[in-house]
Amino acid sequence: MNFNATFIGQMVAFAIFIYLTYRYVWPPIVAAMAERSKRIADGLQAADRAEKDLELAQKKVVEQLTSAKKEAAAIIDQANKRAIEIVEEAKLKAQQEAERVKASAQAEIELATSRAKEELRSKVVVLALAGAEKILESSIDQNAHNELVNKLAAEL
């Protein structure tokens, strides 16, 4: 192999090319690669954070659903208890009203019975007097008649 000036010139040109490449071309390439590597790493970290955040959010959702279900069950139980109380109150009021109506009806029956007895007494007295009058075929005077009516009414 022959070493001549061309070969040395090519070596010098190649050395200058390497120096210029190392000095001006290589730093932007390395910077771009470092930036890209950093973006990839940041993206992976963001994905990990997002995955953890998603897991936390899912746990919170499960906790909130459990809490809401418990609260709903408590509200339903409370509503059922209140409904039972309302039904019991209505039953009690209905029983009281029935007793009041029954007592009122009983009082009316007793009053009607009393009136019927009084009316029957007065009719019996009149009939007895009419019968006695026919038997005696004579008329009793008014004062004696009133006394006899009062006496018979008191006895009945």
From Swiss-Prot:
Query: What Gene Ontology terms describe where this protein resides (cellular component)?
Result: plasma membrane; proton-transporting ATP synthase complex
What is an example of a Pfam family matching this protein?
ATP-synt_B
Gene3D superfamilies the UniProt entry points to: 6.10.250.1580
Named from the GO MF annotations, one term is: proton-transporting ATP synthase activity, rotational mechanism
Q: How does it sit in the membrane?
A: Single-pass membrane protein
InterPro entries listed in its UniProt record: ATP_synth_B-like_membr_sf (IPR028987), ATP_synth_b/b'su_bac/chlpt (IPR002146), ATP_synth_F0_bsu_bac (IPR005864), ATP_synthase_B_chain (IPR050059)
Task: Report TM segments.
Answer: 7-26
Q: Read off the PANTHER family from this record.
A: ATP SYNTHASE SUBUNIT B, ATP SYNTHASE SUBUNIT B', CHLOROPLASTIC
**Family recorded in the similarity comment:** Belongs to the ATPase B chain family.
Q: Which NCBIfam families match?
A: ATP_synt_b, PRK05759.1-2
What quaternary structure, including any partners, is listed in this protein's UniProt entry?
A: F-type ATPases have 2 components, F(1) - the catalytic core - and F(0) - the membrane proton channel. F(1) has five subunits: alpha(3), beta(3), gamma(1), delta(1), epsilon(1). F(0) has three main subunits: a(1), b(2) and c(10-14). The alpha and beta chains form an alternating ring which encloses part of the gamma chain. F(1) is attached to F(0) by a central stalk formed by the gamma and epsilon chains, while a peripheral stalk is formed by the delta and b chains.
Q: What is this protein called?
A: ATP synthase subunit b
| Gene encoding the protein | atpF
